[in-house]
Amino acid sequence: MTKKNDVTRIATGVRNLDGLLHGGLPRGSVVVLAGPPGAGKTILTQQICFHTASVRQRVLYFNTLSEPTAKTLRHLTQFSFFDPRKLDVGGVQFVDLGVILRTKGLEQASKLIMDQVRKIKPAIVVMDSFRVFDDLARSKEELRKFGYELAVNLMAWEVTTFLLGEYGPLDISTNPLFSVIDGLFLVTQREQSGEQQRFIQLVKLRGTEHSRDEHSFVITSKGIEVFAPRVTVQREDRGPGAARCKTGISKLDELLGEGIPRGSSLLIAGVAGTGKTVLLLEFLYRGAQAGEKGIIFSFEETKERLLATARGLGWDLEHEIQRGMVEIVFIAQPNIMVEQHLLMMQERVHAMQARRAAIDSVSVFLHKVKDPQIDREKVFQLASIIQNSQAVGFFATDIPYGTHQLSRFGVEETVVDGVVLLTSTEEGLGRQRYIEVYKLRNTAHLKGRHSMLVRSGGISIFPRYDMDAELDEPPPPLEPARRHPSGGSGSR
């Protein structure tokens, strides 16, 4: 248990959930977990119980008519958090209320519950499902009396109580139970961004500051894992600092002036075939040769294809991987889960202590996002990962064909610190590539388009020295982004 502001809290043991609760659940709270069948209420509660349970902190788990205890235990064995030793020593004790509810009613069930509490003196009590009591109560008055007396008695014993039920929005506004409880967690499941996702929302929790946003979560063999980038990926209050990064790419550093400020993120924007992936790979390869670790998150090309590209350009990228200077993380497009992989990227950058990070590409990573506001928020979170680690990030993005945008929605470039624009035009019987440093905050850089070639050895740039250097100042505070036509992103 932990203390915060003189309130004793119980750690849940669920990844990132304690962060949403600012340290854990206040001891003695009566909390309702509401949601439809299959949303994850029971697994979430059981994971908290087995994390907390010990000989000194016992758990009383009351099963009602919804599911017999034997079936509950059979399902529990699938999860790594399940520890049968805690059953053997009485740390977790299951009690079946089904028979007494069917034969004796609410009053006798309440008496049995409190008799068990006095006998066991638990730290946690669970009732799964509490909705059964609603169905058995003869009136709202009886239900209110039962719920109030039970809550008061359990609070007197400083017992943290979880009441699970298939409650919906109408129940929350009309059921008398919700007027006496301390906390309400909504657990739901629905389709979002083209995939079925589970969400948890902390609607109410007395005596504690907490996030009120919806946060996605998954159920795995380890149990429940909550993804909350709005809480866990927050930008630290720090400026770019004086340190600068030289890319090591031929002539690009001349365009960039004194270098890229540490903590900066650059959008590498262009249509298909303009050299975005090659630029990202060379950025990491040259960094590794200069002693800077780098990582690339690829959502399009597999590790093998990226290595083949590097070999074709004459780079021994495999050697840099073997000596721990470069890491390639491939996630296939159908497997992308934005919030989960945001946290994964944060952890991998931190664990590697990467000085350079590349994403290929943000347009594919966020391809299921249809709302420009959400797209902007996620790019901001990616940029925050880079700034907090004081690395330098190169984010490839596809420009929609036939538009003058610099990104998919036309809002991402307002979030990042710099934009490098890659283009190509027909000249004679071929195409000529160009590179332009469109913006780079706090850095005097060379303006205009400059010729670029991709050939053996990497990228070659031919600067036009008749262009003037320009300093990009930090912009004023951003206003809420307006919706732009999305257009389609070009495929590679």
Where are these predicted regions, by residue range?
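Pre-Walker A adenine-sensing motif
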Residues: 12-24, 248-259, 487-488
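Conserved nucleotide-binding/hydrolysis micro-motifs of P-loop NTPases
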Residues: 65-70, 98-103, 130-133, 161, ...
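Short glycine-/polar-rich loops that comprise or flank the Walker A/P-loop
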Residues: 28, 55-58, 89-92, 157-159, ...
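Flexible beta-alpha connector loops of hexameric P-loop NTPases
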Residues: 4-7, 63, 95-107, 133-144, ...
